[in-house]
Design a protein with these regions (language model features):
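Short, surface-exposed interaction patches in beta-rich subdomains
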Residues: 151-254
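Short linear S-[DN]-x-LW-Φ motif typified by the pepsin-like aspartic protease active-site region
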Residues: 4, 21-82, 96-106, 116-119, ...
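Residues that act as N-cap/strand-start positions at coil-to-secondary-structure junctions
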Residues: 25-27, 36, 68-72, 93, ...
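Short, surface-exposed charged micro-motifs
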Residues: 41, 50, 73-75, 98, ...
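Short, aliphatic-rich beta-strand segments
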Residues: 82-88
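Hydrophobic membrane-insertion alpha-helices, especially the h-region
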Residues: 4-21
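Exposed beta-strand and adjacent loop surfaces of beta-rich binding modules
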Residues: 39, 48, 58-60, 73, ...
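Right-handed parallel beta-helix
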Residues: 108-154, 161-163
Length: 254
């Protein structure tokens, strides 16, 4: 009886060791994409994604996978000139991405959960469920719809539209288009490098805006203070509207 129990225990341990050898693996796989890419489509449920432009007009994808047992195929696909990051790498597998694309590439789609870092791309129209969003040196219009997470934007040459639910929004070096920012909970900080129309709506959080002069200014807060160091030029060519339900509003001239 004892020998039988010992045999069963040995088999259980051996099976556990066998499973351990296949479970919880990580890998970094780099792929060169031969197609000429001009659009990246975000379609992953859970992924940290970093996209930057290259100087040699090439596209590469590095998949950082965490998986059990075996890898199954690639976690991306190519359709014509569109690179799709779908995170589809098999059972109990997740993939993060580091992507390099040609200049002039736009980013569209939806990232369910995870951080999003985009540098030098030519425009963005994307949704993000949960995670931090960092944008830098974007050369076209940006449209973001966010559920939860902070947003940081540096040096944008285009129109900015951001709608957030929870998280701080901070943007500087804005030029080339109107600015529309709305969030339910979180602070909003904007620094405009050139004058353009600005519309900011907050519910709970402070609003700080730095901009050139020459604005027709309207402000409103139900619970908080307003400090307007920008002035109000009734003959100004651009309008600035800043409202929040609960929070302070500060306007400064750069």
């Amino acid at each position: 009886m004892e020998s039988r129990q010992l045999g069963v225990a040995v088999l259980v341990i051996a099976a556990g060791i066998g499973l351990w050898q296949f479970a919880g693996k990580d890998s970094d796989d780099e792929h060169k994409v031969e197609a000429k890419i001009d659009t990246v489509q975000l379609a992953a449920d859970n992924a940290d994604i970093s996209i930057k432009v290259s100087d040699d007009d090439t596209t590469s994808v590095t998949e950082k996978r965490h998986y059990w047992f075996f890898k199954h195929g690639d976690a991306y696909s190519v359709d014509g000139s569109t690179l799709k990051l779908d995170g589809d790498c098999g059972w109990n597998c997740t993939a993060d991405y580091e992507v390099t694309v040609p200049r002039g590439t736009k980013v569209v789609g939806e990232n369910g959960s995870g951080d999003l870092t985009l540098t030098g791309v030519a425009g963005i129209d994307a949704d993000s469920g949960s995670g931090k969003v960092e944008l830098a040196d974007v050369t076209g219009d940006v449209k973001l719809d966010l559920t939860s997470g902070d947003v940081s934007i540096r040096n944008l040459a285009g129109r900015l539209q951001v709608k957030g639910n929870s998280g701080d929004i901070d943007a500087e070096g804005l030029r080339g288009g109107a600015v529309e920012v709305e969030t339910s909970s979180g602070d909003i900080g904007l620094d405009l490098a050139e004058a353009n129309d600005v519309q900011v709506k907050g519910t709970s959080g402070d609003v700080d805006i730095t901009a050139p002069g020459g604005y027709r200014v309207t402000t409103d807060t139900r619970s908080g203070d307003v400090e307007n160091n920008l002035g109000n030029d009734t003959a100004g060519t651009h309008s600035l509207s800043a409202t929040t339900v609960s929070g302070d509003i500060e306007l400064d001239r750069n």
